[in-house]
Amino acid sequence: MKIINILFCLFLLMLNSCNSNDTNTSQTKSRQKRDLTQKEATQEKPKSKEDLLREKLSEDQKTHLDWLKTALTGAGEFDKFLGYDEDKIKGALNHIKSELDKCTGDNSEQQKSTFKEVVKGALGGGIDSFATSASSTCQAQQ
């Protein structure tokens, strides 16, 4: 009888130890899932320079940034423009807006197209002298 009691106690101990391992395993699995979820949350895609700039621009400036993007078609020209100081970019976009506002009338599309080429050439020399070197001929032709 003593042997049966001892064997029974050993059986219960073994059974109890198996259950405790299952609990640890499930806790470990849930911990791993939680860690994976946290890693996914922290691995957001970084924003591009253009997206970061767009957050700081007004609607008019965003419109003229799109216009400028179509003007700067060369390899890396637009990226180079995005590398300039934010205040200089805003100043350039405001200058573009004021010059394009002057282009009205019958041949305004041609004037805007010509101004696009002027802007492209003016930005080739940098943004510092952009406002003085990029002028449209719109008002002079009216």
From Swiss-Prot:
Concerning Pfam families, the annotation shows: Mlp
Subcellular location as annotated: Cell outer membrane
Positions of region (Disordered): 22-54
Instruction: Tell me what induces its expression.
Output: Weakly induced when grown at 35 degrees Celsius.
Record's bilayer topology term? Lipid-anchor
Q: What is its main location?
A: membrane
Key word Cell wall biogenesis/degradation present in the record?
no
* InterPro entries (UniProt xref): Mlp
Q: Where is the lipid attached (N-palmitoyl cysteine)?
A: C18
Q: Which residues form the signal peptide?
A: 1-17
Q: What does this protein do?
A: An outer membrane protein that may participate in pathogenesis. Some human Lyme disease patients have antibodies against this protein. The Mlp proteins probably undergo intragenic recombination, generating new alleles.
Query: What family, per the record?
Result: Belongs to the Multicopy lipoprotein (Mlp) family.
Q: What is this protein called?
A: Lipoprotein MlpI
Species annotation? Borreliella burgdorferi (strain ATCC 35210 / DSM 4680 / CIP 102532 / B31) (Borrelia burgdorferi)
Q: What is the name of the gene encoding this protein?
A: mlpI
